[in-house]
Amino acid sequence: MSNRVKTSIESKLFAFLMFLFLTGIESGAQTDSLYMYLDSTTLSIRRHSSAIKNNDSGATTINTGMIQSLPKIFGNTDPVNFIRQLPGVQTNSEFDSGIHIQGCDNSHNLISIGNIPVYGSNHLLGLFSAFIPSHHEKMTFSTSAGFANRLGGKLDMELTDTLKKPVSGEFSAGLISSQGTLRMRIGKKHHLKISTRGSYMNLLYKRWMQIAGSPIKYGFGDGNLTWLYADGKDRIWADFYFGADKTHMAEKTFDVDLGLIWGNAMGALHWERAGTDVRQKHSIYYTGFLSDCDVSQSSSSLNMTSFISTAGYKGQVNWLNISAGADLAYHMIQPQSPQLHGIIGADNNIQEQQACGEAYTYIRYKRIFADRWTATAGLKASGYLSPEGRLYGDISPEASIMYDIFKYGKIKAEYNLGRQYLFQTGISNIGFPLEFWFAAGKYSKPQRSHNISLSYNANFLHEALAVSASVYYKKLYNQVQYVGSLFDFFSSRYDLHDHLLNGRGWNYGVNLMVHKQSGSLTGWISYSLGRSLRKFDNQGYAGIYPANHERIHELNATASYKLRKWDLGGTFVYASGQPFTAPEYFYMSSGQILTVYGKHNGCRMRPYIRLDLSVTYSFIKNEMQENGINLSVYNALARHNDVMYRISKEDNVYSYKAFSFFIQLMPSISYYHKF
C-alpha cells in the first residue's frame, strides 16, 4: 500500500475519532449503533445501553435514569429494588424492607447519600426506598463497604455536580403515589434541585389492605433538596433529605390496636476541590431516625420509642495513586424501651439513652505494574468510646490484587478486616420497622469480620455480553439476633439482655451472572448460592443455625426491550424460603397468649416466586420534552408468597399458620412528563 493511500486512510480515521469525541457517542447517542462509511469500508460502533457499569475497584456505577427502562413497579424503578436483582443481594419478602448483601444483616451495610449515612432507608413493606430516583443521577454499589465501619456492602446515591439545562424537571402521577423533581440554574454558578413524593395507597387498595382480616392504613411522604455552588475547581453542596411514615392496624384476632409513626432526616454540607494532582472533599453532617409505636389490647397499652442520631465529619484526599481520609461521628441512641400501662404489677425496665463516639483514619495505595497487574493495599486505624466510657482501638488492613487477561477478562482477589460498633436488631418480619439501634458496650462487644473474595469479570462480543463470577467467605464475630415476639412485651418483664442471642457467624457463597449490555434487548440472568450461619453462646442454643434472613438459592432474571415508542420490561425471581422459629405449643393465661417455641429457625417458609411486568408508551420523546404512560403489574403470577407465620384464631381454634402479602396481584398505572 502506498504512503499516499495510508495517509488518506489515517486522515479519515482521525476525522472519524474526532467526530466520536465531539458528539459524545458513549453517553449521548440515541441509537444502538453508529455507522460511518469510508469509501467502501463500513465501521460500526455498538452503544453500551445498559444502566450498569463495573469498574476495577469492584464498585458498580448505575445510571438511575437508564434503569427506568426496567419494570416500573408503581410508576418508577426503585433504586434499592433494582439492587436486589443483582447477584449477591438477597431478595426480600414484602415484610422485610432491609438489604442483605452477601449474607450480611441489613445493619452491616452503609446506605448513604453523598457518602452520608441514611438510617431507615426503606418505607413500609419495602416497596419504596427512601430514594427518589429522579433526584439522583447515579448510584454506586459495592459488596464491600471499604474503610467505613461496616461489615457488609455499600450503596451510595451520588450528588449532582452540574445541571445541563437552565430549567428542567419531571413528575409522575399514579394510583399509588406521585412524585416530582424540579432543577434550576440560578445564575452561572448556583444550581438547585428539589424533589418530593407522597403516597395514597389507601385510596385504591383500602379494601385489600388486610392481614388475616385486620385492616391496615398507611401513608408516607419524603423529599430532597440539593443546592450546588460550582466555581472553577471548587464545588459546595448543601444537601437535605426527610421522610415520614404513618401506619395503623386494627388486629381482630387478639383485639390489638397498633399505631406506628417513624421518620428519618439527613442534612450535610460538602466542599470539594479538584486540583491537577490533588482532589479533596470535606463534609459535615447530621442524620437521624425515629420510631414511635403504640399498641393497645383491652385495658392495657404499650409504648415503644427508639431513635438514633449522628453528627459527624468526613474528609478525603486523593493524590496520584494515594488516597487518605478521616471520619468522626458522635451518636445518641435510644434502644427500644417498652413502657406498659394498665397492667397490675408491670415493671417498666427503662433502657437508658446511649452516647458514644467513633473515629477512624485510613490510607490506601494503588500500584499498576507489568501492564497486567494492579495491586492495592490500605490500613485503617479506628477508635471507639462506648457509652460506659470504655475505649477500644483497632487496626484494620485491606489488600487486593487484580490480573488483567486483556480480552479474556480480569481476575481479582481481595481481603479486608471489617469493624462495626453499632448494632440494629428487633422484630423484623412483621412488616413494621420495630427494629432499633444500640451501641457496642454492655450488650455486646464491637463486631468484626474477616472477608475474602475472588471474582472474575469479562466482556465479549465487543462488550455486548458481560460475564461475572465470584466466591466469598466472611467470618463474623460478636453477632446478635433478636428472639421473641410483640406479645412478649405484655406477658413478662422486659430486659433487652433476655432477648439477644450473642455469637459468631459465617457467610459464604457463589454468585454468577450473564449480562446482555447493548441492543434493543438488554438484561441479565443471575444465580446465587449462599449460606448465612450463626452459632450462639446462649444456653439452650447449642448447634449452628441459619440467620433469620438466609436464602440458600436465588435465581433472578431481568429484561428490557425497546421498540420505538414502547418500553417493555420484566423481572423474575425464585428464592429459597427464609427460616423461622415455630412454636411447640401456646396457651392462654390471664387473657394473654404465652408461647413456647421449638428449635430456633428450625423451619422454613415456602420458596418465594414473583414475576413483575411493565409496559411504557411514550407519546412524545425528543430533546425538549418526554411524556407517556406506564402500566405495571406486581406479582403477575398472583402467587401467595409466605411473608410471616403467626398465631391465627378461626372458630375459637388457635393455630400457627403462614400469611401472605395482603394483595397477591397489584396492577398500577401512572402518567409521567419530563421537560
Where are the model-predicted features located?
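Gram-negative outer-membrane beta-barrel transporters
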Residues: 473-475, 498-584
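C-terminal beta-signal and adjacent terminal beta-strands/loops
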Residues: 574-591, 609-610, 617-675
